[in-house]
């Protein structure tokens, strides 16, 4: 068994879509990034890579590479899952937390879980996604950005 942790953060800006866990969330702002800036999927990909000491998404998908400009983070996650499978591992379970003051994530959590489960090739009962606020504190609390953490347990295939 291997355990990995991932973290990501992006700034909220106008004139961008807000995509979280592969779900397009209606909101007045979106996350700024080289790709679609899906912080949840980025944290999950980092957790998967970290569990096998394979670096992070910046190593595999550098923001200096035009090929990843506007990239769909679901495709990036699917690629990372392929990498862990070539190393003989699969997702045992995954627990992730989105930290955002607004918008409310609860209406979208189940769709996020289903998207992540599909990308990881596992049943949805192995994937947990939850959201919290920081009670108005810090950059997420003031609405400047959104962050996410993920912890994953990989098991031999």
Curated annotation (Swiss-Prot):
Domain of life, per lineage: Bacteria
Binding site for 4-CDP-2-C-methyl-D-erythritol 2-phosphate: 8-10, 34-35, 56-58, 61-65, 100-106, 132-135, 139
Gene Ontology BP terms: isopentenyl diphosphate biosynthetic process, methylerythritol 4-phosphate pathway; terpenoid biosynthetic process
Name of the top EC class for this enzyme: lyase
Keyword Lyase: yes
GO molecular function, one term: metal ion binding
Pfam families: YgbB (PF02542)
Cofactor(s) this protein cannot do without: a divalent metal cation
Pathway of action: Isoprenoid biosynthesis; isopentenyl diphosphate biosynthesis via DXP pathway; isopentenyl diphosphate from 1-deoxy-D-xylulose 5-phosphate: step 4/6
Catalytic activity field: 4-CDP-2-C-methyl-D-erythritol 2-phosphate = 2-C-methyl-D-erythritol 2,4-cyclic diphosphate + CMP
CDD domains: MECDP_synthase
InterPro entries registered for this protein in UniProt: MECDP_synthase, MECDP_synthase_CS, MECDP_synthase_sf
The protein's Enzyme Commission number: 4.6.1.12
UniProt keyword list: Isoprene biosynthesis, Lyase, Metal-binding
Residues that coordinate or bind a divalent metal cation: 8, 10, 42
Assigned protein family: Belongs to the IspF family.
Protein name as catalogued: 2-C-methyl-D-erythritol 2,4-cyclodiphosphate synthase
Organism: Trichlorobacter lovleyi (strain ATCC BAA-1151 / DSM 17278 / SZ) (Geobacter lovleyi)
Lineage: Bacteria, Pseudomonadati, Thermodesulfobacteriota, Desulfuromonadia, Geobacterales
């Amino acid at each position: 068994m291997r355990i990995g942790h991932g973290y990501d953060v992006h700034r909220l800006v106008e004139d961008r879509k807000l995509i979280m866990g592969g779900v397009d969330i209606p909101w007045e702002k979106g996350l700024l990034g080289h790709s679609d800036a899906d912080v949840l999927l980025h944290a999950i990909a980092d957790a998967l890579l970290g569990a096998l000491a394979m670096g992070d998404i910046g190593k595999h998908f550098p923001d200096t590479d035009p090929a990843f400009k506007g990239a769909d983070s679901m495709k990036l996650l699917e690629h990372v899952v392929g990498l862990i499978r070539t190393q003989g591992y699969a997702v045992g379970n995954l627990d992730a937390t989105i930290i955002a003051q607004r918008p409310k994530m609860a209406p979208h959590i189940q769709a996020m879980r289903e998207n992540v489960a599909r990308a990881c090739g596992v049943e949805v009962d192995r994937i947990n996604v939850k959201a919290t606020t920081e009670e108005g504190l810090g950059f997420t609390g003031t609405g400047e950005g959104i962050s996410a953490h993920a912890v994953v347990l990989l098991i031999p295939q």
